[in-house]
Every structure is written in C-alpha cells, then in structure tokens.
C-alpha cells in the first residue's frame, strides 16, 4: 500500500493521526467487525470558517503589527558560502545528508536547556543561528521554522494542513555568550508563538519585500525539530514502521531537521544541489556538532571563541596546509613564468578588479604592447621605470610590460602627495613614468 498525499491537505501531525486511526481500525476489520471511529467535534471546513472570522479587525492588526515590528529591516538574504553561483531563478534540485549526534551530547543539550529554562528547540535553534552567523559573517540571522498550528483541542484529531511557518530572528553578536543568545532566542520564540496565527504569506505581504526569483522571501534556511515522529505500530499481525526515502528536491537553500532516536538526536540536512556540494554540507554538519560540544561545555563563553574546527581540521589548517615549500625555476624571470602560464591557459582568468578583468592571454598581449612601446622610448635592460598606478588590471599590465622590456619598475603609490611623488621620481632617475590617464599631473 502506497499512500501519497499533497501537502495542501495534510501535514506531519496528520500522518500520525492517520496511523493511529489505522491501528485502531485494522484489527477490528481483520476480526470481521465493523470498524468505526468516534465522531469528530468539528471538520476542517469548520476550522477554516472560524479562522477567517477570528483573524480580522483588531486581532488581525495586532498580529500584523507584531511581525512588521519584529522583522523591520531584516536582511532579505543569508549569504552562505556556496560552491556555485546562485542561479537567476531558484531551482528545486536537492539531496539529503543524515548525521547522528552522540547520545551523550544529546543528553548534555537537554540538560543545558533545562538549566537555562529553555526548550530543546530553543537551544538547538540558538546554536544553529550561531553557526549560520559564523558561516555567513552576518549578525542579523532570520531562520524559518514550522509550527503545528493546533492550538485548539478540537483540531488535534483532524487531518488537514494546519502548519504555519514562523520567521525567527536573532542578533548574533560574536561578543555574546551562548547563554545570552539563548535568552534572546527564547524571548523571540515566545513572542512568535503568541502571534503564530497570521499565515506566513500574509507576513511577507505585510513587509512588502522586493521580489527576487533567485531565492525564497525573508529566509532561505529552515530549521525543524520533530517532536512527533511517525511511530512503529503493531496491529492485526502487521508491523508498520517509517521508511526513510532519499529526496531529490529542496524547498530552501538549506533545511536542517532534528529528531529524537534511541541513540540521540539525528540531524537530516536537506540542501539545494545547485548551490552546495555534499562535502560542503557534511563539513557544516560536523561544525554544528563541534559547536554544540563547545557551547554545552562552556555556555558562558563568547560565541566567537567557540571553535568550529575538530582537532583533525585544526591540524590540517595549522600544519598540513602550512607546508607551502615548493621547488620552482630559480633562474627563470617571473615574466617568463607568466608567459608559460599564459601559453598553458590563455583563456583562464588572470586578474579581476572592480573595473574589469582579463584572461592570461589578454594580459600577456597587453603587456607585450607596453614592452614594445617602452623599448621605442629607449628603455634598456636594468633601466628604471616609475610605475604609479591604482590597484587595477592596468597595474598588472604595467609591471609585466616593464619586466618584458628589460627594465626594473619603481612602484610609487598615487595616494602620496604630489610633491613627494615628484621627488621620489626624480631620485629614481627613471627614464619613463608609466601611469594612468586620470592620475596625470
């Protein structure tokens, strides 16, 4: 039996309702009885009518005002370092990666939550937002998170889409201790829970955000803690258990879901493969675990001081990658080495600046032109040539061109006062000055 349900008519809570009712009905059916369930107090349509009538007037305005104030000025993009440029139109290709957190660490996270008067979700969210801040270099972090939306007892047994999405914002300053960040996240969550009834699409509408086809509005990262995982059921001789399926889609840039298992917390990382490689996400998951280990050991220390690197990564950075010695042709001039590279990879990018870029082939050709011009101006081997340019593609052309002509360049910073530049140029006894047109005089 394969049951496929569109998200427009169901949510995670509803699946558990279905399984619970199946476990009640199937044994009766097998025994030859007539399966029956208690009558529901209301239907989903009744809830929809009630919600429309309730969410208007002062109630609606209070909900809107809260979210407009809470999310005012929030960044519309979280710039995580990706492996590829972001497509102009968002894609949905994705993959999943599962990482089991150690049981001892999971217990320490629960103990920390209890000591700080926070829920497990709040503690994990605060840690995750700290990770995102470290990765992105941003301090204003907005993360989406689903909420069941079943505040009334009458709807607990209904099958339908009740879930809503909350945008949870945190100011993750590196100078904060994790305890201080957790207190902030706790207040943000409590405020969001009290105003959870405004549908997320109305929150986006109220904020009047600029449309961007390359990313989802307001947040691009989702965080989920599953408190009601699908149970394993025994009914009428049948054994039912969840079957994990590898998804090939991703709703957001990154979705991290955690759930309790008998071996500790299991994290599932769903990522957009148009942006991230599997190894990148695996590394992020390892860093999340390292961060959790650090903050549970010392929740009073500054977030910026909690290491993300494992001992193996630390050795790799400080020792293995520091071994940079390499043999090179010591008798070959640098411009000759450059020419060899230009021949090997003429189309590869050589220099990029704010005002342009050139390939190796283009840079070599321009440097050759300058070298020829310098020789016509009398530059001979070991003659000095002043090179006075701002950082640019032209600066690279100038340095290589002078070397190709056989000269030695004398670099002068154009930011120096004019009189100082004049004196230094005269002292160098240079034959020619190479500069940019806008710097003349």
Language-model regions: role of each:
Residues 1-43, 64, 69, 80-82, ...:
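Carrier-protein-dependent adenylate-forming modules in NRPS/ANL systems
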Residues 8-9, 41-45, 69-70, 79-91, ...:
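N-terminal beta-alpha "docking/capping" segments at the starts of catalytic domains
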Residues 45-50, 319-322:
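Short, contiguous pre-domain boundary segments
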Residues 50-65, 88, 95, 111-125, ...:
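His-Asp-centered acyl/peptidyl-transfer active-site segments
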Residues 73, 80, 143-150, 411-412:
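RNase H-like polynucleotidyl transferase catalytic core
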Residues 78-80, 97-101, 170:
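Generic detection of short hydrophobic beta-strand segments and adjacent strand-loop junctions
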Residues 92-106, 330:
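DNA breakage-rejoining catalytic core of tyrosine-based enzymes
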Residues 257-261:
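Short beta-strand micro-motifs enriched in acidic
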